[in-house]
């Protein structure tokens, strides 16, 4: 198996979440682990401390960022050939199927590869993802906004999306800061 850890968050209770992606049967899938403060896997989270989330149809998921919502739910985001992707988990590691479609919220910018590398949670519960969209060797900074339910917020940008490219430059969004 091929596994990649790409992000870490410490929960208020001291438990450590590590997100990333693994090679699964139909491509890459989101992987989430939770460790107790002594470094052992949390047996009360997922299956023995590990959650692997794979969606049918070959939707490749490479997690890059993670955030904790005020209610304890966990957002793991990244993307791939199908666009930006975010999966929301309950505090026990089960997928929150009320988010997006069966727990998965997506936003495609182009026919190419789109990846979210930044995440921010707004006070009103909305979720902002930033990263890049690569199509025909033109890379653009890409930003989208979802509602707290995992639906693209059509009031943001053009149809919930914003893209910006610097002519003659490879433009990739790597982080997101809110203030």
Predicted regions and their residues:
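A sequence-level/structural motif corresponding to short, flexible coil/turn segments enriched
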Residues: 1-179
């Amino acid at each position: 198996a091929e596994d990649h850890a790409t992000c870490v968050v410490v929960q208020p209770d001291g438990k450590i979440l590590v997100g990333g992606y693994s090679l699964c049967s139909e491509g890459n899938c989101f992987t989430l682990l939770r460790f107790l403060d002594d470094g052992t896997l949390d047996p009360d989270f997922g299956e023995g401390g590990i959650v692997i989330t794979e969606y049918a149809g070959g939707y490749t998921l490479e997690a890059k960022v993670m955030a904790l919502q005020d209610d304890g739910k966990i957002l793991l985001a990244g993307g791939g050939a199908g666009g930006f992707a975010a999966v929301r988990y309950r505090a026990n590691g089960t997928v929150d199927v009320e988010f997006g479609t069966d727990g998965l919220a997506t936003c495609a910018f182009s026919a190419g590869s789109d990846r979210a590398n930044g995440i921010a949670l707004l006070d009103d519960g909305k979720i902002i993802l930033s990263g890049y969209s690569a199509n025909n060797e033109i890379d653009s900074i890409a930003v989208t906004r979802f509602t707290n339910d995992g639906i693209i917020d059509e009031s943001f940008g053009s149809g919930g999306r914003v893209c910006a490219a610097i002519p003659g430059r490879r433009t990739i969004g790597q982080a997101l800061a809110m203030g």
